[in-house]
Structures are given as structure tokens and as C-alpha cells.
């Protein structure tokens, strides 16, 4: 019996792409990430949600190892982000919200420079076509619209052919059709086993893509589970109202 449960535990651990335990981060006397624990399985889409200032960005930075946590442990693909960065980031894609690129650098040049950083890559021309940017190949990045830049940043995150990708504010700046096109592309990648960790302020997007979610409020976990579980444990039936109830409870109480 003991061997049976040990086998189950090992299989579960092998299937876990991201594991975070008791993560904490403070700035002075202000705790911005308070004892957060989560796990994300292979091929799963996990959404980290919360109002501005809830601690989402700091949590992601601590998970990626770009910001030092005060305490807690993090593993991505079984590796410690702060100790095994080179090996880890061969297998992790990160979408950056804002980046300063050389003036007049072309889309194709930026993609080629990104490809040179990795051993095994996805053909960026295929990705540009999937995300509706193939006609911008020779365009300067500075001349792209906000929505086009957003899609390009997703493409750059996918170029290293990652096993897990972090997408921050996934489709901000995109129109309805472009957002749905991005959803479709990511759903196809998920079917191939890609693990996706995302943040978003669009609840229809979260409902469409996410297998599980975590909602933060002032650095604390106020909900963790599936969207169905979130709805069932609230007084609301629409997920957007459920999210507001969890993330911005004071505002909602004024209207109840």
C-alpha cells in the first residue's frame, strides 16, 4: 500500500510544471505577497488574477527568480529559478509588457535575434503567421500598433519552443477578433502540452482559457480552484461578478 501511494506521489510530481510553496515578499513593513502556494500541471492553463496592486506582478517576478522572495520555495520544471537559470530559461518563455528596442529594428530582425539566444526554436515566420503578423515582417517594431506589439511579444515568448510560458496581461490592447485569434492559437498549443501561466483583466478570456485560477487580494490568496468552484462558493452566477466579489469585496459590498 505504501509503495502504491509513493508511486502516485511520484507521478503527480512528474506532472507538475510549476510548484510554489509558502512564498512571501515584503517591502519594508508592507507585505505584498503573503504565504502563497500553488501548483500548475503540464498542459494546464493557470490564471493569476487580482486588482491592480494585488501582488500579481511581484508574485510572477518571485516565481521567475527575477526578484528575490523573502521566503518560500519555487520549482519550474523541477529546477530552482535562481540557481539553474540558464538551463531553465531554455525551456521557459516570458512575454514582456514593455521593452525598449533599438530604434528602427525590424520585426524580422528582432525575431532572428531572439532565435539566436536558444538552441531549439520554433520558426518565427510560422508564429507570425499564426498570430496575424506575417505582413509586418519588414516593419519597424516602433511602427506597430499597441495590439500588434502585444501579439509580437507573445510570439517572442514562444520562439524558444518552451515547455511553459508566462503571459502577463495577455491580450491588452487587442480588439475582439484579435483576442479570439490569440485564444485559438494558445488553445492549440495547450493541446500539444504547453503549460501556460497567465494574468488577465478580461474575465471572458479567463473563462475561455483557464483550467484553474488563483485570485489575490492585497497579497493574500482569497480563492484557488476552478471557475466552476469559484461560482459555486459565491452568491453570484456570472464569473465577472464572482471575480469582483473576491478581488474587490469592499466595492461590491456597497452594491449588495
Pin down the residues of each PLM region:
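Conserved ABC ATPase "signature" region
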Residues: 112, 116, 121-136
Amino acid at each position: 500500500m505504501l509503495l502504491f501511494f509513493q508511486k502516485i506521489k511520484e507521478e503527480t510530481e512528474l506532472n507538475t510544471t510549476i510548484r510554489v510553496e509558502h512564498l512571501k515578499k515584503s517591502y519594508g513593513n508592507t507585505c505584498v505577497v503573503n504565504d502563497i502556494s500553488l501548483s500548475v500541471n503540464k498542459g494546464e492553463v493557470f490564471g493569476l488574477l487580482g486588482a491592480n496592486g494585488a501582488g500579481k506582478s511581484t508574485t510572477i517576478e518571485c516565481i521567475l527568480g527575477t526578484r528575490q522572495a523573502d521566503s518560500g520555495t519555487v520549482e519550474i520544471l523541477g529546477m530552482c529559478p535562481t540557481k539553474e537559470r540558464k538551463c531553465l530559461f531554455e525551456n521557459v518563455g516570458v512575454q514582456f509588457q514593455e521593452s525598449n528596442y533599438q530604434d528602427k529594428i525590424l520585426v524580422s530582425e528582432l525575431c532572428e535575434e531572439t532565435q539566436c539566444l536558444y538552441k531549439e526554436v520554433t520558426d518565427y515566420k510560422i508564429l507570425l503567421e499564426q498570430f496575424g503578423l506575417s505582413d509586418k515582417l519588414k516593419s519597424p517594431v516602433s511602427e506597430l500598433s499597441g495590439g500588434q506589439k502585444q501579439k509580437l511579444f507573445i510570439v517572442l515568448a514562444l520562439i524558444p519552443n518552451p515547455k511553459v510560458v508566462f503571459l502577463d496581461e495577455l491580450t491588452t490592447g487587442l480588439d475582439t477578433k484579435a483576442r479570439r485569434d490569440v485564444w485559438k492559437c494558445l488553445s492549440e498549443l495547450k493541446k500539444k502540452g504547453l503549460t501556460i501561466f497567465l494574468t488577465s483583466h478580461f474575465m471572458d478570456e479567463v473563462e475561455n482559457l483557464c483550467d484553474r485560477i488563483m485570485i489575490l487580494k492585497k497579497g493574500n490568496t482569497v480563492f484557488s480552484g476552478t471557475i466552476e468552484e469559484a461560482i459555486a462558493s459565491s452568491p453570484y452566477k456570472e464569473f465577472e461578478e464572482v471575480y469582483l466579489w473576491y478581488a474587490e469585496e469592499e466595492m461590491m459590498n456597497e452594491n449588495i
